[in-house]
A protein has these predicted regions:
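A detector of repeated loop/turn-to-beta-strand junctions in beta-rich toroidal repeat architectures
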Residues: 53, 93, 146-150, 190, ...
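Beta-rich, blade/repeat-based domains predominating
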Residues: 24, 30-45, 71-90, 95, ...
Length: 284
């Protein structure tokens, strides 16, 4: 067994803490009603939702924010596939849509076994084109439910939509491990993060609780290149791949969602009430 001297251990801990504390926050855009669903496109821009205003917006470095869609029906989570197509959870229409580069919109999911979905919220797309999304319900959405459970679903590249898991609490944020072999889901009611193993066909197994208790209500998750989970739940809790909390970033206003982006995928984009922010290490 190798034992570290106290001085070496203290230095290691100090450098480790600096990795998460040496962040510079920039306010990119503001004046929205409630922002959600940041998603970075490989073509060099960020998409985010202004949910109450039914708008999808596009932020490109050095350019004014553009309205991509003004009829997005209560958009929440967004994601891009390898082809640059945009996937959006629409809470008002209770469906998942895909927008191609020409602007054509198609519906991917709106019912399960003949019943309307609750209100799709978080979404992520694998490299092979598999789509996973969460289906909770909040506020007025709860009064119009046809399903008697909250769910996580999988839409394979070919074939019918599948139910990954039923939740008693409301699943919210969703993302992958860096290698795409683990699916992470935040449970807003249980205040935990669950993990599922994914096989080469995208089938999920080994459902388990990875983070037993998050800080606040977990509404968004992003994973960095080291596999650490950045969980938005008011503040930002950072957890290692084993679920151990490494650090907490305290925020003045609650963070609803987060996503990594830009060319090096090391900028953390945050939706904070009516504001969109970016965090990077001070030296970057």
């Amino acid at each position: 067994m190798i034992r570290l001297l106290p001085a070496v251990l203290a230095l290691s801990n100090a450098l480790f803490a600096q990795e998460f504390t040496d962040l510079k926050f920039d306010r990119l855009s503001q004046g929205y009603r409630f922002t959600e669903g940041p998603a970075w496109c490989k073509d060099g821009y960020l998409i985010f939702s202004d949910t109450p205003s039914d708008r999808l917006l596009k932020w490109t470095p050095g350019s004014p924010v553009e309205v991509l869609r003004s009829d997005a029906h209560g958009p929440a989570g967004n994601a891009f596939d390898a082809q640059g197509r945009l996937y959006t959870c629409e809470t008002r229409t209770r469906r998942v849509t895909r927008t191609d580069k020409s602007g054509k919109i198609g519906v991917l999911a709106e019912r399960w076994e003949g019943k309307r979905l609750n209100a799709p919220n978080g979404i992520v797309v694998a490299k092979n084109g598999s789509v996973y999304f969460t289906d909770p319900a909040f506020g007025e959405q709860s009064d119009h439910r046809e399903l008697d459970f909250y769910g996580v679903y999988h839409i394979p590249p070919k074939g019918a939509m599948e139910l990954v898991a039923k939740f008693t609490g409301r699943p919210h944020g969703i993302t992958f491990s860096p290698n795409g072999r683990i699916l992470y889901v935040a449970d807003a009611d249980a205040k935990n993060v669950r993990a599922f193993d994914l096989d080469k066909n995208g089938e999920a197994s080994n459902d388990r609780v990875l983070v037993p208790k998050t800080l606040g209500i977990p509404t968004g998750i992003a994973v960095d290149d080291k596999g650490n989970l950045w969980v938005a739940g008011g503040n930002i809790g950072i957890y290692n791949p084993e679920g151990k909390r490494l650090h907490t970033i305290e925020m003045h206003d609650p963070v609803s969602a987060c996503a990594f982006g830009e060319a090096d995928m090391k900028s953390l984009f945050l939706t904070v009430r009516g504001v969109v922010m970016r965090a990077r290490h001070g030296g970057d």
